[in-house]
């Protein structure tokens, strides 16, 4: 696709996304992911982004998580816990305010970037059908979920691929409490990781010749 054609297509797609994200909360309460590869941007940068569509305003806190030994990650969604066996990487974070999570010290991290240049944005909520649910149900008691994805990726991963493999391993081992998509990037590549069911996941390296806007198509809800 020629650059001008792609820009026209992206303008239309982004306009549609604005319509979705400007809709009342009753109409949609999920997220929207964006991907624009380097060859389609004026400055040669890749853009991986996500907005939260669950409310008109989503207040966030910004900060730096220091490097620490043997970090214990735990969730306020479930009873999930996992302890690292190494020294974590220092990273910046965008988190929910603590008072939204019972004043826990490790409130849900929506995005961030670590000292190795690995970034993560989590999540876009998805769903599974009845057949998948019967075969591999979600682990709502102790499964990993969006509360921990970004913190674990940023604290433990030196590359995007390493982050993908780590989250995949944790999903297989502990199960997941929800179906989600998250993006993980480093200076060389970007990935979308999809948690499909209780213990199944898939990941795709985002292509250099295609752009996308994903308005949570599998989970859209419309007002009557």
Q: In which residue ranges do the predicted regions lie?
A:
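Hydrophobic transmembrane signal anchors and adjacent membrane-proximal interface regions, especially
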Residues: 18, 91, 152-154, 202
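N-terminal leader/propeptide and maturation segments of large enzyme subunits in energy/redox metabolism
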Residues: 144-160, 165-166
């Amino acid at each position: 696709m020629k650059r001008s054609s792609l820009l026209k297509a992206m303008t239309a797609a982004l306009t549609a996304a604005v319509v979705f994200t400007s809709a009342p909360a009753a109409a949609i309460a999920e997220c929207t992911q964006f991907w624009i590869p380097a060859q389609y941007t004026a400055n040669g940068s890749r853009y991986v982004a996500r907005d939260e569509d669950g409310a008109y305003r989503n207040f966030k806190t910004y900060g730096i998580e220091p490097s620490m030994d043997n970090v214990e990650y735990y969730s306020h969604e479930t009873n999930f816990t996992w302890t690292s066996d190494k020294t974590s990487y220092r990273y910046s974070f965008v988190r929910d305010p603590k008072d939204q999570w019972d004043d826990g010290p490790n409130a849900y991290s929506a995005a961030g970037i670590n000292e190795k240049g690995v970034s993560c944005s989590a999540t876009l909520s998805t769903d599974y059908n009845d057949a998948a649910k019967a075969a591999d149900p979600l682990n709502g008691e102790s499964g990993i979920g969006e509360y921990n994805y970004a913190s674990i990726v940023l604290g433990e991963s030196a590359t995007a691929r390493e982050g993908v493999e780590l989250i995949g391993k944790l999903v297989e081992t502990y199960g997941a409490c929800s179906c989600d998509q998250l993006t993980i990037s480093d200076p060389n590549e970007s990935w979308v990781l999809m948690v499909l069911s209780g213990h199944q996941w898939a990941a795709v390296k985002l292509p250099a010749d295609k752009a996308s806007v994903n308005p949570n198509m599998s989970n859209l809800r419309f007002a009557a």
